[in-house]
A protein has these predicted regions:
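Glycine-rich loops and low-complexity Gly/Arg-rich segments
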Residues: 29-34, 66-70, 86-91
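Glycine-rich beta-strand-turn "strand-cap" elements at beta-sheet edges
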Residues: 38-59, 82-112
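Short amphipathic alpha-helical segments
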Residues: 14-44
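N-terminal non-cleavable signal-anchor helices
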Residues: 5-8, 16, 105
Length: 112
Protein backbone atom coordinates (compact mmCIF):
# COMPACT_ATOMS: atom_id res chain seq x y z
CA UNK A 1 0.00 0.00 0.00
CA UNK A 2 1.01 3.59 -0.62
CA UNK A 3 -0.45 6.63 1.15
CA UNK A 4 -0.41 10.08 -0.42
CA UNK A 5 -1.54 13.23 1.38
CA UNK A 6 -1.79 16.81 0.16
CA UNK A 7 -2.62 19.96 2.11
CA UNK A 8 -4.38 22.52 -0.08
CA UNK A 9 -4.91 26.18 0.84
CA UNK A 10 -8.19 27.28 -0.72
CA UNK A 11 -9.08 30.98 -0.70
CA UNK A 12 -12.02 31.53 1.65
CA UNK A 13 -14.17 33.01 -1.13
CA UNK A 14 -13.73 29.84 -3.23
CA UNK A 15 -14.58 27.20 -0.60
CA UNK A 16 -18.05 26.33 -1.95
CA UNK A 17 -16.84 26.15 -5.55
CA UNK A 18 -13.83 24.05 -4.52
CA UNK A 19 -15.92 21.51 -2.58
CA UNK A 20 -18.52 21.28 -5.35
CA UNK A 21 -15.79 20.89 -7.96
CA UNK A 22 -14.07 18.22 -5.91
CA UNK A 23 -17.33 16.24 -5.71
CA UNK A 24 -17.99 16.65 -9.43
CA UNK A 25 -14.48 16.05 -10.77
CA UNK A 26 -12.21 14.20 -8.32
CA UNK A 27 -14.74 11.90 -6.65
CA UNK A 28 -15.51 10.13 -9.97
CA UNK A 29 -11.75 9.57 -10.42
CA UNK A 30 -11.63 7.94 -6.98
CA UNK A 31 -14.59 5.70 -7.88
CA UNK A 32 -12.92 4.68 -11.14
CA UNK A 33 -9.63 3.79 -9.43
CA UNK A 34 -11.44 1.93 -6.63
CA UNK A 35 -13.43 -0.07 -9.18
CA UNK A 36 -10.14 -0.99 -10.88
CA UNK A 37 -8.62 -2.17 -7.57
CA UNK A 38 -6.04 0.62 -7.48
CA UNK A 39 -7.50 2.76 -4.67
CA UNK A 40 -8.23 1.39 -1.20
CA UNK A 41 -9.76 4.53 0.34
CA UNK A 42 -9.65 8.32 0.22
CA UNK A 43 -10.89 11.35 2.14
CA UNK A 44 -11.21 15.10 1.73
CA UNK A 45 -10.94 16.80 5.13
CA UNK A 46 -11.51 20.45 6.07
CA UNK A 47 -8.79 21.19 8.62
CA UNK A 48 -9.50 22.75 12.00
CA UNK A 49 -5.96 22.17 13.26
CA UNK A 50 -2.84 23.24 11.36
CA UNK A 51 0.71 24.05 12.39
CA UNK A 52 1.10 26.00 9.10
CA UNK A 53 -2.03 28.06 8.55
CA UNK A 54 -2.22 30.28 5.47
CA UNK A 55 -3.98 33.60 5.94
CA UNK A 56 -7.13 34.02 3.86
CA UNK A 57 -7.53 30.31 3.26
CA UNK A 58 -9.36 27.23 4.40
CA UNK A 59 -7.00 24.28 4.48
CA UNK A 60 -7.95 20.83 3.22
CA UNK A 61 -6.19 17.53 3.68
CA UNK A 62 -6.59 15.09 0.82
CA UNK A 63 -5.58 11.59 1.96
CA UNK A 64 -5.52 8.69 -0.48
CA UNK A 65 -4.48 5.10 0.10
CA UNK A 66 -3.53 3.20 -3.03
CA UNK A 67 -3.17 -0.58 -3.22
CA UNK A 68 0.25 -0.12 -4.89
CA UNK A 69 2.41 2.65 -6.32
CA UNK A 70 0.76 1.94 -9.67
CA UNK A 71 -2.45 3.46 -8.33
CA UNK A 72 -0.73 6.75 -7.57
CA UNK A 73 0.61 6.96 -11.13
CA UNK A 74 -2.78 5.99 -12.57
CA UNK A 75 -4.39 8.76 -10.51
CA UNK A 76 -1.95 11.48 -11.54
CA UNK A 77 -2.27 10.49 -15.21
CA UNK A 78 -6.07 10.19 -15.11
CA UNK A 79 -7.73 12.67 -17.51
CA UNK A 80 -10.36 13.51 -14.88
CA UNK A 81 -7.71 14.42 -12.32
CA UNK A 82 -5.66 16.38 -14.84
CA UNK A 83 -8.73 18.48 -15.73
CA UNK A 84 -9.69 18.98 -12.08
CA UNK A 85 -6.14 19.90 -11.10
CA UNK A 86 -6.15 22.77 -13.62
CA UNK A 87 -9.50 24.04 -12.29
CA UNK A 88 -8.54 23.66 -8.61
CA UNK A 89 -5.29 25.61 -9.05
CA UNK A 90 -7.34 28.79 -9.50
CA UNK A 91 -8.93 28.36 -6.05
CA UNK A 92 -5.67 28.08 -4.14
CA UNK A 93 -3.53 30.61 -2.31
CA UNK A 94 -0.13 29.65 -0.98
CA UNK A 95 1.80 26.55 -1.91
CA UNK A 96 0.31 23.10 -1.32
CA UNK A 97 2.19 20.54 0.74
CA UNK A 98 2.45 16.97 -0.57
CA UNK A 99 3.64 13.83 1.18
CA UNK A 100 3.60 10.18 0.23
CA UNK A 101 5.19 6.81 0.68
CA UNK A 102 4.81 3.18 1.59
CA UNK A 103 2.17 2.51 4.24
CA UNK A 104 4.00 0.87 7.14
CA UNK A 105 1.11 0.29 9.57
CA UNK A 106 -2.63 0.54 9.18
CA UNK A 107 -5.77 -0.33 11.09
CA UNK A 108 -9.27 -0.74 9.79
CA UNK A 109 -8.38 -0.60 6.12
CA UNK A 110 -8.81 -3.83 4.18
CA UNK A 111 -5.49 -4.77 2.59
CA UNK A 112 -7.06 -6.54 -0.41
Amino acid sequence: METVTVVLNVATQHVEAFEAGFRNHELPVWHDLKDRGLLVGATLNRLDISSRPVEGSVQYLVAVIFSTGEGHHAHDGHPGFEAWNRIADAYQVGQPLAFGGETVLQLGIPAD
